[in-house]
């Protein structure tokens, strides 16, 4: 068994989680920087350009959702096989990332190219921003296959206990995007000023470079995997298992996208200034949210490995440490955002109307981010335990079943401020619900001794050779 994978079951938990989390957090922050950097430079084009990016953002979240979900399914399955000592099955599962990434990426490209206008109408685009949003949507979707591959390949490599190479993929792409943005958006030097098209093109080029780095790692024998041609051939049963386990992560992201679609439609009644304000607030908050995703990415293979090895005590210790650590970090980050909200918003826009709307949106939205963190950890835990239905329910509850109704209710009662307040209100309710689920599962497993007697999930055995 690869040494890195063995460490998931033997290395001291604090140092292991820190070693896995730091590169993973760096990688997810780098991913988030695509949108943040685009917004920073696009803000020079006016608030309508920012609003166009805000409208397209939910579609981008859906693309990321599929990549994150597929990656989570691969990670849970592969780390569990490592825990059981079945390296051949781990390689077989890993080989499916190529087919899955290509299929999902091409699907999103086709949808954006063929149905841009109805998609934008559904996302709440106002007439004055539709053309800019259409250009940005179509061009960025050309990079969808590369983006999905980066996310899935990164999760696969991370499942073997290697968090550094996924970080390199993400950061390389992000740095390239930051370098290209001013040249292509503003037309520096020999480059033409492409405006919002330049922002989209810079993102696509950067994503393609990140994907090429991932290909080099996987096919150049730079990881713990030894993927052969027989592993790459699509395996319908194995693909179904990956999708089943990864669906909660996708749903968690997709419901966030659907929630923002509803949010955008509510805010569109207040004009493009309100859309620009939420675009800025969400991108700034999204950057703060990325460490949560990074830590959950680190936790999932630890849970999966120790579940496969039957080490229940270590599994729950990892969950507890992850929750405490990320909640403390988010509490400190909340203070920074609350104190420096005007300065943070000022990085994106100097329009007085937009700033006046975005500052309270950011402050109110960030008030409860420390309560979001454990909910995401709990979803990752249930994924690692192959409890897909429970993870799916929690993912649906967080954004869709609670947040969306509160947005409509609070906006009706208190207007624009009510829409902002719906965010921390829903986060608080969901924390209470998700904690009840995870505590019940913990007590049940302690009482039944399932960690000693657990049997492999029969549904997730299709990657075995017969």
What are these regions (language model features)?
Residues 8-40, 44-45, 58-73, 77, ...:
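N-terminal transmembrane alpha-helices
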Residues 29, 33-51, 120-127, 183-194, ...:
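Helix-terminus/linker motif at the lipid-water interface of multi-pass membrane proteins
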Residues 50-110, 147-166, 277-335, 339-341, ...:
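Small-residue-rich hydrophobic transmembrane alpha-helices
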Residues 112, 155, 181, 185, ...:
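Structural signal for membrane-spanning alpha-helices in multi-pass inner-membrane proteins
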Residues 19-38, 139, 173, 206-210, ...:
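Transmembrane helical elements of multi-pass membrane transporters/channels
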Residues 1-21, 78-145, 191-247, 303-368, ...:
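Short alpha-helical transmembrane segments in multi-pass integral membrane proteins
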Residues 71, 140-158, 166-174, 199-213, ...:
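Short runs within selected transmembrane alpha-helices of multi-pass transporters and secretion channels
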Residues 62-65, 177-182, 211-215, 287-290, ...:
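Hydrophobic transmembrane alpha-helices of multi-pass small-molecule transporters
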């Amino acid at each position: 068994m690869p040494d890195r994978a063995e460490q998931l079951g033997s290395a001291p938990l604090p140092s292991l989680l820190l070693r896995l989390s730091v590169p993973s957090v760096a990688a997810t922050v780098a991913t988030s920087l695509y949108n943040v950097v685009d917004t920073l430079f696009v803000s020079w084009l006016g608030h309508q350009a920012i609003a166009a990016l805000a409208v397209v953002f939910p579609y981008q979240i859906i693309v990321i959702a599929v990549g994150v979900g597929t990656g989570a399914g691969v990670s849970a399955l592969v780390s569990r096989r490592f825990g059981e000592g079945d390296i051949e099955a781990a390689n077989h599962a890993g080989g499916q990332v190529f087919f899955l990434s290509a299929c999902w990426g091409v699907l999103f490209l086709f949808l954006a190219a063929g149905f841009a206008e109805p998609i934008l109408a559904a996302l709440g685009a106002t007439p004055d921003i539709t053309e800019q949003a259409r250009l940005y949507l179509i061009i960025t979707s050309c990079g969808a296959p590369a983006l999905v591959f980066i996310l899935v390949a990164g999760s696969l490599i991370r499942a073997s206990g290697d968090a550094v190479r996924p970080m390199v993929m993400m950061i390389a792409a992000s740095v390239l995007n930051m370098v290209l943005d001013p040249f292509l958006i503003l037309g520096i030097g020999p480059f033409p000023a492409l405006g919002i098209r330049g922002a989209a093109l810079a993102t696509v080029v950067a994503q393609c470079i990140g994907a090429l780095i991932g290909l080099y790692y996987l096919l150049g024998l730079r990881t713990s995997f030894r993927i052969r041609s027989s592993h790459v051939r699509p395996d319908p049963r194995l693909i179904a298992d990956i999708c089943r386990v990864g669906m909660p992560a996708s749903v968690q992201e997709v419901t966030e996208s659907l929630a923002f679609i509803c949010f955008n439609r509510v805010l569109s009644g207040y004009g493009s200034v309100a859309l620009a304000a939420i675009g800025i607030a969400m991108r700034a908050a999204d950057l703060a949210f990325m460490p949560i995703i990074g830590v959950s990415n680190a936790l999932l293979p630890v849970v999966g490995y120790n579940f496969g090895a039957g080490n229940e005590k270590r599994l729950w210790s990892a969950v507890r440490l992850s929750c405490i650590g990320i909640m403390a970090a988010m509490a400190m980050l909340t203070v920074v955002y609350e104190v420096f909200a005007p300065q943070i918003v000022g990085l994106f826009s100097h329009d007085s109307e937009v700033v006046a709307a975005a500052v309270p949106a950011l402050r109110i939205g960030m008030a409860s981010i420390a309560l979001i963190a454990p909910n995401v950890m709990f979803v990752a835990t249930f994924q690692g335990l192959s409890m897909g239905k429970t993870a799916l329910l929690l993912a649906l509850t967080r954004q869709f079943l609670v947040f969306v109704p509160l947005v409509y209710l609070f906006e009706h009662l208190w207007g624009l401020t009510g829409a902002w307040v719906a965010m921390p209100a829903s986060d608080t309710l969901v924390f209470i619900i998700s904690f009840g689920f995870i505590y019940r599962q913990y007590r049940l497993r302690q009482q039944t001794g399932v960690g000693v007697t657990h049997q492999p999930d029969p549904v997730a055995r299709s990657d075995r050779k017969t």
